[in-house]
Swiss-Prot record:
PROSITE patterns: MATH, USP_1, USP_2, USP_3. It is found in: Nucleus. Residues 190-500 form the USP domain. This is Ubiquitin carboxyl-terminal hydrolase 7. It holds the Pfam family MATH. Residues 29-169 form the MATH domain. The active site is at 199 (nucleophile), 439 (proton acceptor). The lineage of its organism: Eukaryota, Metazoa, Ecdysozoa, Nematoda, Chromadorea. Keywords: Hydrolase, Nucleus, Protease, Thiol protease, Ubl conjugation pathway. It catalyses: Thiol-dependent hydrolysis of ester, thioester, amide, peptide and isopeptide bonds formed by the C-terminal Gly of ubiquitin (a 76-residue protein attached to proteins as an intracellular targeting signal). Belongs to the peptidase C19 family.
Amino acid sequence: MCSPDPEDMHILTNDIPSFDKSLDPYGPEGHLALDIERFSSFMNKPDSRIMSKPVIVRGIPWRILAICRHQQNNRQVATSRSRNNYNFGFFLQCNNDDLLQKRGMWRCYGQATLEVLNANGPPIQKKIHHSFHNTEVDWGFSNYDQYDTLTSPKDGYVIDDVIRLRCRFTADVPTGANYMWDSKKHTGCIGLRNQGATCYMNSILQSFYFTTGFRRAVYNMEVGTEPNESNIVLAMQRVFYELQMSSEAVETNSLTRAFGWDKLDAFNQHDVQEFCRVLLDNLETKMKGTSEEKSIPNLFRGNMKSYIKCLDVDYESSRTESFYDVQLNVLGMDSLERAFDAYTTPETLDDDNKYDAGDHGLQRAEKGVKFVELPPVLHVQLMRFQYCGVEQKINERFSFPEKMNLSNCCELGPMLNEEDCVYSLHAVLVHSGEFHGGHYVTYINVNLHESAVDPTATAKWCKFDDDVVSRTTTDDAIVSNFGGEKAMNSSAYMLVYVRDNAIDQVLAPIPDTQIPQSVSRTFEMERMHRNREKKKQEEEQMCMSITLVTPDILATNHSFDLIEPVTITDVLPHETVYKHMVTAELYQFVQEKLFEKSTLPKVDMFDSDDETRMKRKEILRRLKTKKFGFRLWRMTDSYTVDKPQKMASRLRPSDFIEYSIDTRLDHTLSHDTETIYVEHSQFLQPLNEYLPTRDILFFLKYYDAITDKFTIIGHVTLDSHKRLNLYRMTFCDLLGLPKDTELKYYIEHAPNHVEQIDDPNRSTISRLVDDQDGAIVIVEKADPTAKKDAKTKMIELYNDVEFEFSQQFYSKMPNEEPFELFTKRFCLEQKLTDVTEFIGSELNVDPRNVMLWTRVSGSRFEPNFDDYAVTGIQCKYLTLRTLHDPRQHKKYSVSYAIFPFPVNEVHTTRMFVRLYRQMPNGNVEELNLFPPKDGTVTDLIAEAKRYYPSVEGGSGKFRLLQIGTSPLNNQRVFQIYNENTAIVDLDQRPVYKQQAQHTLNCRIEEIPHDELDVAQGEFFCPVVHYDREPTKLFGVSFVIKIRNGELMTDVRDRLRRKLPDVSDAEFAKYKFALLSRDKLCRNIEFNAGEKVNLMDMANQTTGVPQVYIGLDHKSPSQHSNEAAIRILN
């Protein structure tokens, strides 16, 4: 099988007829026919092609493509059997129209049978399946069959030089970026959106929705007084109402929120059968005491009788119990009928298993079940998931009929007659995948009610695959889901049958007019609210927010730059403007906001009618010649370039917004939030002319040495080609100083870089500020007696930083509480020793014992001792090693710890290690210690006791255990370390490159009284928890003392005492085993009289036990796919 070569372009065909409109163009299947006349002539013309009439399936044209191709590479030589040197190619072609080719990337999976009809017998049939896409639109056979075979008169394939080709095919819904499948239009139904892994829920909800008796009951339920967010009834009504009234796929977020699920729950796939039971039970509980109390039982509940009937005497014992679904075995069964027969076939009680019939004594009897009442809607759960040592899915072939009679499985009588046993298949819920994951879809016969009422109506099966709904064939819905194909691993998992005599009641359509008014009113109001919100969001996307900054606002700033960022974000008002307005309209908008109202008419920018367009056109005509007494500038947060030192950013007016009736605002302002500086006239003088090629916008900032304060005087336009000193008299005039006052000049490039202009006559203004608008020139009187100048003051402001100090603990003493937070301002150039001395004086501790750090890794503070040695280090080290920006960083958080010894000992005589400690409640927590570098386990334990003393009634003795840290040995205990073992010889791994810091694979715990002494013949055996497989460890491992020759039942009792938080009922479910190296050695049965054999648990020469005891029970934090479904509201 292959696709034809693209160079085969010669086509032998007449005009292709138009599409056959009598067929459903969006249906799942099609039939193609092509009769090739003068076939011998066709096969003697190389590279000729002919195509059939197209048939539209899934909205795509399909054709038969026949090709005569020359045999390539002489692989086939003409012989007496093959008198023709050309191959006959037979292909199915998908979507090869030029118009459809322009759709871009697309993909469509199809299956087909390619046939050559035979006048004398069966046709030649060859099957294909292929995923067609935009670069591979043909699939089939380059050499369908031998030319001699096709043309042989006795074979009957070519009659009168005519060959007849046929193709039967089915296709899935096409996918692709430009294929928008309209489920409502093509099927009359809509789907449900998948939140992540909620396909199981979507499948059963669709089945419930088309069970209109259930939908009607949900509509009629009382909503109650629960909050909307947790109201399951309201959420179910919303889903059903949207499925009935909407034209787009429905969201289920409100339903899962009402269940009490979070976003993560939506990514946990569950069992559809379990979800069905839990949801029905929840809704039935909510219906109690209301008019709908019996709705669910009347739809889904049946009764079965369990009986034991004696064969030789007249005696029978029976009881009747209700059911909401029937669970049938799949393993070993090949059909639904056989599974029902096996379910109700009685078991004979004979020989040693006779039934005790009371006064009749032991009797031969039959034990079985019979259905005594069948529900209108029968849910059949197929048990395809089983645990047989391992978790597995049973994908064996299991057929089920479209029509079913259960009379052989029933006890007919007044409550159940023959007609009550006849069912029609309504829905098939299908699972594809394996045990722990996969995908659910459902097939529903949406025409079952109509076909039951009208004998001429046919089944209309639809496939519901989350948000995509498509028509499908009956075979695809039923036969294709019998299972048995390993490659597909897709099979029916749940069947929904409806009793024939109840179809009119259970599946009766619900016209829109029959939906309760309270339901319609509620959700129509929600729909209107959503539409308003949607319109609001669309309008917001067409708008931007601007903040207007004026010279009087700048005058309030006495610090860095022109304005504090917080003033823009939190203080000044934010105005909304239309992105598509032109800059002239922005000028008009600012004029009305800040200066004076306009006589121009108002228009709504969101209206697009003719009247609005005409009004706007008139406004633009009048604005074309209008003059404004201000200029607008875009303020940007940018960095200076080509400067020798790294500098903070600066917020300056940098881009002039030119007045125009042609330039749109979104072509000038690119962000959704922008800051605009309004440059208007000051000092009772008209606004100077601005030429972008000549002038630079400057801001004048004055430093008064007497008041020690900066003041922004205003803006001024300077000629970039002139020297700065030429404007001295202008500056004096603006500052109100005598015109002969000598001035000193500085350029404020950034908060951390102020440059003094030593010779204002040497360089042009453009060179001083890199030809950038928005530059700040600081001026001050040239007073040699002043104590400080503007640059010194700016450095002083920059280095003055507030720090907030909070205490952290490495090894927290019991009941020890941290000191309260406190703040202090420091100069960034001060030494860290000043900080530690301040903390020491505040807390009355030795400053040498104070450890500082700011680095945070996740939720854990990670100090680096080499970097944070305080001697000779400045406070700027506490700014997280980033460039300090005083406009953004108003306060830095610094953590400190108080050690019981000088910090510098960590580098000299001590080492930092992290290990684990077993708490009295059984939990494990991290422990940080500073033992001597040349110490032993005894020193390590002594250091631990400083922070964690013995519990009341404890032995006061501690031990150190080697544990595992990888996922495979999760905290598993390997051995108990000897107290004389050197710390450097312990199992450890570096945390950082610095050798002073390590994590030990160890755990410290207090020794129980009964394990203090170890006699001859006694030893400690590790114990682990695992879930079915020895590699799936969980929980906290521990050790237990075992004596050679003692009863195994005593060991079990000692294990029981080690687990005080486990109930007796739960402990009874535990299984026990001997494990070695993550593998099972043997199970432990604890038989009466069985004793411990030391040889079974021999130690290796290393002292590490070869085997350990495993407790097999379910993990509390089981796999998400195995977690039980919970509906919390």
